[in-house]
Regions:
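Compact soluble domain cores
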Residues: 1-69
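Short, compact, well-ordered microdomains
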Residues: 59-107
């Protein structure tokens, strides 16, 4: 059984323009985003199917790395995705990994 990891290195943290704009005008939303990032880093990927959750765990334990995803809702039920591309891909160098906070419609 693979255990839920703590994710120490998620690369560069990016926000889409939509999320960034909303954070600038809505303090509660910005606070929620900070809290959701903490959940994500702690290996709590929110509202994912069991298959997607397991895929995240496998990617964390796979030496080839992979992609991680979390799906959440903010205080007003706005859906947020957090996606890490290139997690643990040491063969591509440390600058390859990045984590993006976005609205699903921005994907």
């Amino acid at each position: 059984m693979l255990t839920k990891p703590n994710l120490p290195a998620l690369g560069r943290l990016l926000f889409t323009s939509g999320v960034s704009s909303r954070m600038e005008i809505d303090n509660q939303f910005a606070s929620d985003i900070s809290n959701l990032i903490r959940l994500y880093v702690d290996g709590d990927w929110g509202d994912l199917s069991a298959d997607d959750w397991e895929a995240n765990i496998i990617a964390c334990h796979n030496k080839a790395g992979g992609r991680l995803m979390g799906a959440y809702k903010t205080y007003d039920q706005t859906r947020i995705w957090i996606i890490t591309d290139g997690y643990s891909r040491q063969d591509l160098g440390p600058d390859y990994c990045y984590t993006t906070v976005l609205f699903p419609e921005e994907y």
